[in-house]
Amino acid sequence: MSEKEIWDKVLEIAQERISNTSYQTFIKDTQLYSLKNDEAIILVSLPFNASWLNQRYSEIMQAIIYDVIGYEVKPHFISEDELASYNNVNTQEVQEPQVQHSSIDDKTWGKEQFNMHNTFDTFVIGPGNRFPHAASLAVAEAPAEAYNPLFIYGGVGLGKTHLMHAIGHHVLSNKPNAKVIYTSSEKFTNEFIKSIRDNETEAFREKYRKIDVLLIDDIQFIQNKEQTQEEFFHTFNELHQNNKQIVISSDRPPKEIAKLEDRLRSRFEWGLIVDITPPDYETRMAILQKKIEEENLDIPPEALNYIANQIQSNIRELEGALTRLLAYSKLQGKPITTELTAEALKDIIQSPKSKKITIQDIQKVVGQYYSVRIEDFSAKKRTKSIAYPRQIAMYLSRELTDFSLPKIGEEFGGRDHTTVIHAHEKIANDIKSDPTFKQEVENLEKEIRNQ
């Protein structure tokens, strides 16, 4: 596979996993400059974009690249301005990536896993994250003595990964010889599958079970993966029985993770479950002010106020808006004002009717309307009282979100994409033939948009 083919596939996956705004603004036009020495050099247009991507998207891009090429490399974003100095240091000819022979090569338990910017010192505390921050700090100070496991859940871009990295940094600062692993459930799954294929399951288990702290991100992705759940169940048990700390993150609480074995769900609930909610106005302003201080930027308070008022969904999009503004100002050659800020962000400012809708939002509203439990949308039950609302929720998921058909199917218990297509066609036909039902669906859509 050529480097161009690799990067085309990476971008294809990134478009599914990263918000459309962030993908279009920062990821879409990136180029793979080189792939060698366990490092992927990725070219972007502006230095600030490179800095922001290295801080915020390194982990997710690392996981995506791993999924494509089958071995781990560290992504490093550089701007065109930095390219000359990079070439001076790295004069070797770019080589085609070579597949490594072992999936269990990485024995690094150190700080190299963690984003250097994601520490407790850089975490801005507000009402929506005060409790998760306190719980994370307690775990980092005394692993396996405070809350075990610690389960952190909340929407995308609210700081779950930041807290997990902060825990890793803190543990290793206090105990440099501690064995700490940070991974995602997708990476855990991929390594597990590869270990079976390469007959290296014992090495895989040694890696994940003979450690002091396990930090595992996005655990919801192990739903429907029976063998992975079985493996993680035994990994969890061994770590917990040996008094080792486990920290788990998810976009939803354990009880709402469909197709999760009950024995795993109950173990996730053994310790402390904390949720992170979107930041309030004061927290959003504090985040922006901290960011411009870190980057030594000069931005008028009224411009920050505009961003904080308009971007309310999550921290990632808040910082993304700031990055977009800086890029727009530089490319236009104009000073930053409130007017320029509005102009720069006009394509990403979300009105109440165009705010980002999740499949969970849709399931919640449809479930309440038809008296269907959230977990029943993912169950195998085919009674009409459940199956028909499920089809309505699938229809609305396709109409109101940008998620792919496989992703929608995954959120409804791992159903095939053809099931989603059938549901959409059926509900669309029923809407055409039944004016009363059409009004019912329109009311549901209005309620979903106004959440």
Swiss-Prot record:
Top-level taxon of the source organism: Bacteria
CDD domains reported in the protein's UniProt record: AAA, Bac_DnaA_C
Keyword Membrane appears in the UniProt entry: no
Location of the region described as Domain I, interacts with DnaA modulators in the Swiss-Prot/TrEMBL record: 1-71
Chief location category: cytoplasm
Residue sites binding ATP per the record: 157, 159-161
Any one Gene Ontology molecular-function term assigned to this protein's record: DNA replication origin binding
Subcellular location: Cytoplasm
InterPro entries per record: AAA+_ATPase (IPR003593), Chromosome_initiator_DnaA (IPR001957), Chromosome_initiator_DnaA-like (IPR020591), Chromosome_initiator_DnaA_CS (IPR018312), DnaA_C (IPR013159), DnaA_dom (IPR013317), DnaA_N_dom (IPR024633), DnaA_N_sf (IPR038454)
Pfam families: Bac_DnaA, Bac_DnaA_C, DnaA_N
Keyword set, alphabetical order: ATP-binding, Cytoplasm, DNA replication, DNA-binding, Lipid-binding, Nucleotide-binding
Region (Domain III, AAA+ region): 113-329
CC annotations in GO: cytoplasm; plasma membrane
Region (Domain II) location: 71-112
Record-level GO BP terms: DNA replication initiation; regulation of DNA replication
Role, per record: Plays an essential role in the initiation and regulation of chromosomal replication. ATP-DnaA binds to the origin of replication (oriC) to initiate formation of the DNA replication initiation complex once per cell cycle. Binds the DnaA box (a 9 base pair repeat at the origin) and separates the double-stranded (ds)DNA. Forms a right-handed helical filament on oriC DNA; dsDNA binds to the exterior of the filament while single-stranded (ss)DNA is stabiized in the filament's interior.
UniProt free text on domains: Domain I is involved in oligomerization and binding regulators, domain II is flexibile and of varying length in different bacteria, domain III forms the AAA+ region, while domain IV binds dsDNA.
Description of how the protein assembles with itself and partners: Oligomerizes as a right-handed, spiral filament on DNA at oriC.
Entry protein name: Chromosomal replication initiator protein DnaA
Taxonomic source organism: Staphylococcus epidermidis (strain ATCC 12228 / FDA PCI 1200)
Lineage, highest ranks first: Bacteria, Bacillati, Bacillota, Bacilli, Bacillales
